[in-house]
Every structure is written in structure tokens, then in C-alpha cells.
Amino acid sequence: MSLQWWRDTCREADPQMRRRAAERQDRLTKPRGSLGRLEQVAIDLAALQGRERPSLERIWVTVFAGDHGVVAEGISAYPQAVTGEMLRNFVRGGAAISVLARELGAGLEVVDLGTAFPLEALPGVRHLRLAAGTANFVEAPAMGAEECLLALEAGRESVRRAEQAGSQLFIGGEMGIGNTTAAAAMACALLDAPASALVGPGTGLDASGVAHKAAVIERALALHGAHRADPFETLRRLGGLEIAALAGAYLACAQKGMVALVDGYICSVAALCAVRLNPACRDWLLFAHSGAEPGHRHVLEALAAQPLLDLGLRLGEGSGAALAVPLLRQACALHAGMATFAEAAVSDRPA
């Protein structure tokens, strides 16, 4: 594989289909603009899919899992063993994303990039085991260069499987105790912002726990701060295996011409990193929701993203993105199924 494949050309949206979809929206039996952002969503999907009437029948969800060495600093309300335990829950159907994927009729795969504790082979889990989690980034880079490259490639491979399955939409989810700390550290570096502005409770820390997390991140930023201008170095030094895989998946989606629906804070930080690695991938990213973590809003603003939902979510797993899929499907259904003024013999507003 090319060591910097993410720099390869991204697909371009179809300007002719964008124009035709916009013209169709203006002919539908409604006041122009009355369906608000649903109209623009349908137009954007038409341009990205190269179809005047887009559809989202086949959805692919991949949950990437990996552990984080920074958990040793006491930054999580949950023990590290939960990461591996949740992998079992995913494939047994008991996790939130498992339920939501079933409801959507979506394909669900789980990729173990590196849990801290070895797991038995679980049916339905791809055990890559690139490392036993990351290193503690207040002491050393979270990942070696090769580990980070392999994690990026794992995301790319997941999109390749989604493409082979004929999927029209890719959702990446994540699982990893400590990954809101890694995401916040990356966001601080990429946005050149203090930890106090971007750190939140994660899985449920109290105020003192949040303050401690911010202090831990500041220590990491002091250690790795000289590399802030390099998104790959920021990813490998402060990120996680699952965050790297998410970034790789978003980049691959743009290169293959598949729309990606980005979930919450951690996924949005991975998306920000992907955009810094290859700015052209931004057009292929839709953003599902604005989550409860305070840093999420700042990351969305940096991406000029307008999330579809605002429900106070902070679960991860891809759950917020899955919840937004019915809204996208309804936007497509309205765009394709409504009659035009001419078809319905309804008088349009005078030109």
C-alpha cells in the first residue's frame, strides 16, 4: 500500500445532478424552501450519488474498537475491561448500535484493532489486534508510525467491504474506554485550543474528574506540542487505533465516492483529522448530530458542519448517526415521491 494513500484524489460531486435536483425541488408541490434543510440534504445526496433521485436503502455500519494507555491516568469513570466486554455485547445484539442497525436493516461489523486484554475469537468480530491498546500519551506517542498506518488502512478496508456489499452510506462507530480523552487531546492540537475549552465528562466524570482530565491533556500537549501542525503526527501521538481507523474510513469513502455519515465527538475529531490530511474529503461527510461533549461544537464549527440532530447524545458506537438515517431516508423519499406542480395540476406561484 502507498504510505500516504490518503492524499490520492477524492471523487467529485456531480454538478449537473446537483442542478437537476435543485430544479426538481423547486417544482414540487410546496412553497420553495418549505422543507428546510431536508431539501438541501436531498440535493447534496443527489450530487454525491450522481442520481437526480438519491436513495439510502443499503447502510453499512462498522464499529472500530481499541483501548487507550492514558486510562492509567485515571481519566475514565469505567474500567478498561469494558472495551472487550462491549465487543461481546455488540455481536450478541445487546448494544445500542446493535439494536439500531437491526431497525435500519443495516449491515454491522465490529473490528477489534487492539483491546488491552486478549479476547477469545468472537463470531462477527474482525480481530486485527494491531497492539494491546495505545501507549500512555503523557509519556510517549500513543502509536508508532506503522501502527497508525495499519489502523488507517483498517478503516480503508472496511469501506472496501462496504462498497463490495453495494452500500450507499457508511457509518463509523467507535468503542474504547478513554477515547473521549484522546479525541479531546487531538481536537486541542488541531484547533490550537486549551483543554479546558474542549474537555467534557465523557462516560460520566464529575467536575473534579473533568478538571483532572484537562490537566492530563495539557501534559500531553506539552510533550507533543511541537507536532501540532502535522495531522498525521497529531493522530499517532494523541489519537487511538479506532480514531485512526475512522479517519481512514472517511478518507476512503471520499476516494470511492461513498457518502459517510459522521457520528459524535470522537468521530467528528477523526473527520477533522481526515480533512486536514486531505481537504477534498470534506464534501463526502454528512454530520449526524451535535453531542453533549462541549468540544463537539467547536469541532463542528471548524468543519463548517451543520448537524442534523441535537439530542444531547454522548454514547458513541455510531448510535447518533444511526438515529439520523431515517431523517435522510425521508428527505430522499420526499424528493423522489412528491408530485410536481405540473404532475398534480396544482397552480404554481407566478414567476
Curated annotation (Swiss-Prot):
<keyword id="KW-0169">Cobalamin biosynthesis</keyword>
<dbReference type="GO" id="GO:0008939">
    <property type="term" value="F:nicotinate-nucleotide-dimethylbenzimidazole phosphoribosyltransferase activity"/>
</dbReference>
<dbReference type="InterPro" id="IPR017846">
    <property type="entry name" value="Nict_dMeBzImd_PRibTrfase_bact"/>
</dbReference>
<comment type="similarity">
    <text>Belongs to the CobT family.</text>
</comment>
<protein>
    <recommendedName>
        <fullName>Nicotinate-nucleotide--dimethylbenzimidazole phosphoribosyltransferase</fullName>
        <ecNumber>2.4.2.21</ecNumber>
    </recommendedName>
</protein>
<dbReference type="InterPro" id="IPR023195">
    <property type="entry name" value="Nict_dMeBzImd_PRibTrfase_N"/>
</dbReference>
<dbReference type="Pfam" id="PF02277">
    <property type="entry name" value="DBI_PRT"/>
</dbReference>
<comment type="function">
    <text>Catalyzes the synthesis of alpha-ribazole-5'-phosphate from nicotinate mononucleotide (NAMN) and 5,6-dimethylbenzimidazole (DMB).</text>
</comment>
<comment type="pathway">
    <text>Nucleoside biosynthesis; alpha-ribazole biosynthesis; alpha-ribazole from 5,6-dimethylbenzimidazole: step 1/2.</text>
</comment>
<keyword id="KW-0328">Glycosyltransferase</keyword>
<dbReference type="InterPro" id="IPR036087">
    <property type="entry name" value="Nict_dMeBzImd_PRibTrfase_sf"/>
</dbReference>
<feature type="active site" description="Proton acceptor">
    <location>
        <position position="317"/>
    </location>
</feature>
<dbReference type="GO" id="GO:0009236">
    <property type="term" value="P:cobalamin biosynthetic process"/>
</dbReference>
<dbReference type="InterPro" id="IPR003200">
    <property type="entry name" value="Nict_dMeBzImd_PRibTrfase"/>
</dbReference>
<keyword id="KW-0808">Transferase</keyword>
